[in-house]
Amino acid sequence: MAKERGRRNLKKIKESSQSDSLKTLKADPSPSREAAQIDVNTFFGLVNSEELDYFKQAESTLNANAFENSEERQGFVSSVFEEAKGKELKLVTNQICSKLMERLILNGSDRQVKRLFKAFNGHFLSLAVHKYSSHVLETLFIRSASVIENELLNNYQEEEAEEEESDEVFATMENMFLFMLAELSSSIQKLIVHQYGSHVIRLLLLIVGARELPSSIMSNSILRSKKSKIARKMIEIKDNQDSNRAYQVPAGFKNELQELLGLIAKDKDSKQLRELAIDKIASPVIQLCIQLEGLVDKDRTIWTTIFPEVDDKDPKEEAFVEYLLSDPIGSHFFQAAIKYQKPKTVHRLYDLYIKDRLLKLAKRETTGAFVVKELLGKLKATDVTEMLDILIPHLSELIENNLEIGQAIVDASIARNNYGKEGIISQFLKVFNDANVLESVLKLSTSTLGNTKNDWPTAEERRCAIFLEKLVEYDDSFLDAVIAALLELPEDRFIQMCMHGVFSHVVESVLVIERVDIVKRRRLLNIFTEHVVTLSCNAYGSHIMDKLWQFSIKLNLFKDRIALALFENKDKIKDSIYGKLVWKNWSMELYCRRMYDWKNLIKQQELELFPDHRGAPTLLKKRPLEEPKKVEEKKDKSRGRRRYH
């Protein structure tokens, strides 16, 4: 009998073992998918044609929001609530009427929310697994969290007259909420793998965990599915002030959180929880459980069941980690899960399964690269510098199709006193040296720049712009490259960039007086001064005009030309809400009425920025017969700006 080979044969056996484990993961159907078929009644009757016409018109009226005041709107909402009384269940399960119910919840009073909550008692499970009513429940639960906080703070905003006229007696919102939790808890293991019910469970976990409740329309929201977020934008259902914030909840909600997490993990071993972690429906729920369990469980039962704390490699765990690093759903789970773990815990997984093939994983741009990016911000300094030593020499390859990994490497370098900066710069310059950096990074030729259809900037454009801004901030060589590329653009294209919702931020990022030499400042200002009015009256260009107040220091000829253009077109400037802010931030009222004071303001600005400059001009003196007036220091009038709309 032939002698078996040594290490090579062992390697084959090991690979075969891992392959079998991976096949098992891939071959298994979604966990408990058949069990997730919840047998409940979701039919509560049909809305007749007359009712449908009335409620459809009411939905349109609320959407138009053409009420003269809030009292008129509240009166209309109350009348629709009254008309819907006794019909709530069939309305929330109707496609058109469910949108109306969401609007009523968003505009209703605390008492009206309680009345609706009471109408759903005993039917929450049925509503949670229905395509339309599940969305209504999510909106209702967010409003309920607001009411619970009001009750805790004794901050009731109900009209006393309404309570006196009504004979209805309601329990506290807290008790009603707990009663609903009890109804859903019995089916929670089926709900977490249900197409609609899983979203409801995610929201409930956030509420009882006192975490921020996300927007239902933002692209990165964990509250709704992608289709739901797009649909809500199309039908113009906007969140009220209750979203995008956390609420105070009773202390007893911690016990509810602990109970919910316990029910989700009940009777589940590593294999079953791992199946849930890679299931496209259940995975976001398990991510959230891992995020929250540290609040009530020091042992972090769900995490340690999925990733047992052992010192050596485990073939099954190794196969599972490999699947996570090669699967889009799995990599998203892995990235989100390690974000909330201690560096020591994450180090074990990195050291056992990732370190030896870090570069290979970083090249998996749709899977493993996201985990590598998270590790760069999570691990200890020694691990991160080790990662940088491996990744930096190959940075030019990595960013060809994945700019985000480049940004993560730059962030990691900055966080560690610019570790490996020279290598990073040389790698980036390999890519951008022989090409226009704006085209290489922003892909201007295929972007929404210059579109006349009011296209929103794409998510890809936002990512590319943020990456380029990061490079400009990182080193002057990138700043110079971007300025050179801007100056090479046709003038109309340059101005289009200044008025673009995303690319205008890139232009703003180079307008830093301390880093740009005077020759380049003159060349840029030459272009800006020809388009003062256009930029001032634009939502994005007006921010660039604000920055030019400081960018034109010691180039007073350009500052005067800009001020003169504003003055000569003051009617048009003042008619624009954006132009008014530019007018204010350039102190144009002072320019019109007290030119000496305006000139002195400029001199003070120069002295503040260059206090040690020899031969700095002195403040202009007033006319002899006028009473001297002290020039007040210019206050910072910079206005807030959202980061990409």
Swiss-Prot record:
Protein's UniProt keywords contain Phosphoprotein: no
Residue spans of biased composition, Basic and acidic residues class: 623-636
Stretches of the chain forming a coiled coil according to its record: none
Stored InterPro entries: ARM-like, ARM-type_fold, NOP9, PUM-HD, Pumilio_RNA-bd_rpt
SMART domains (alphabetical): Pumilio (SM00025)
Compartments, record wording: Nucleus, Nucleolus
An MF annotation (GO) of this entry: mRNA binding
Biased composition (Basic residues): 1-11
Pfam family for this entry, one: PUF_NOP9
Domain of life, per lineage: Eukaryota
GO-annotated cellular components: 90S preribosome; nucleolus; preribosome, small subunit precursor; small-subunit processome
Residue stretches of each Pumilio repeat: 83-118, 119-154, 183-219, 259-304, 316-351, 353-389, 489-526, 527-564
GO BP annotation list: endonucleolytic cleavage in 5'-ETS of tricistronic rRNA transcript (SSU-rRNA, 5.8S rRNA, LSU-rRNA); endonucleolytic cleavage in ITS1 to separate SSU-rRNA from 5.8S rRNA and LSU-rRNA from tricistronic rRNA transcript (SSU-rRNA, 5.8S rRNA, LSU-rRNA); endonucleolytic cleavage to generate mature 5'-end of SSU-rRNA from (SSU-rRNA, 5.8S rRNA, LSU-rRNA); negative regulation of gene expression; post-transcriptional regulation of gene expression; regulation of biological quality; ribosomal small subunit export from nucleus
Chain residue ranges for the region called Disordered: 1-33, 619-645
Keywords of the record: Nucleus, Repeat, Ribosome biogenesis, rRNA processing
Similarity comment: family membership: Belongs to the NOP9 family.
Function: RNA-binding nucleolar protein required for pre-rRNA processing. Involved in production of 18S rRNA and assembly of small ribosomal subunit.
PANTHER family associated with the record: NUCLEOLAR PROTEIN 9 (PTHR13102:SF0)
Protein name listed in UniProt: Nucleolar protein 9
Gene: NOP9
